[in-house]
Amino acid sequence: NGASASAAEIVSGSLQDMDRAVLVGQRSFGKGLVQSPRELPYNGSVKVTMSKYYIPSGRCIQQMDYSHRKADGSVGAIPDSLTSVFYTSKGRPVRDGGGITPDFKIEEPETPTMMFYLMTDFILTDFVADWSQKHKKIASPEEFEVTDEDFEAFKQYAKEKNFTYDRQSEKLLKNLKEVAKFEGYMDNDSTLFNSLEAKLTPDLERDFDRNKDQIKKLLTSEIMKRYYFQKGELINSLKDDDVLDKALEVLGDPALYQRTLEAPEKAEKTATL
């Protein structure tokens, strides 16, 4: 996925280029540069790019184009339209300039703004600390699940602690109102803006229920870390992992596995047989 970089990309990309593995997940980060640190005066240092990584098909996985900078000095990713096509050992087309694209893409669900606040606020860890005092023992990582009762208890705890969060839509609406006021539209359309603002105002009860499944996953993760540490958290997370499920599906279907590794023309012929 997007957190996979450097060595992970080189290994997975090489296996893909040699048609020795089927990749499942999201596109990787795209770090294809070799950098070496150099010391500077006054305890400073700088990383100097020494070379680039190229994998068996001849492609480079580097995503950010540092050779072409914008007017403000910033850099951008190489657009897909400017990437080149390369071929695996069996003739499957693959592209450079943007990390490793898996053979089976599994989209990651979007994370609402509220979830970021829950993950960075101490309210989650504080609740689990209290919860653990009432639950000296819990089920194994393979069997443990957060109940609806636990979810409701956490929601009530958040209310009592006056948990608050900002929403991007609310910020954008505020900016839009300022622009509308500057351009003279607020006098005529203030009622419309007020109505929209009311709908976009954070509602903890509504937003908790709307994101119930993701919040229960967060709670489960925090509880697992407290009782079974990182290993237990990982074992528990595999119970509901779309990437793992797809990988097991592909591994359990030899025909699909082989067809995925074939060149497009041959794969089409095989599928029709």
Sequence positions of predicted segments:
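Short secondary-structure transition/capping segments
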Residues: 13-21, 49-51, 69-79
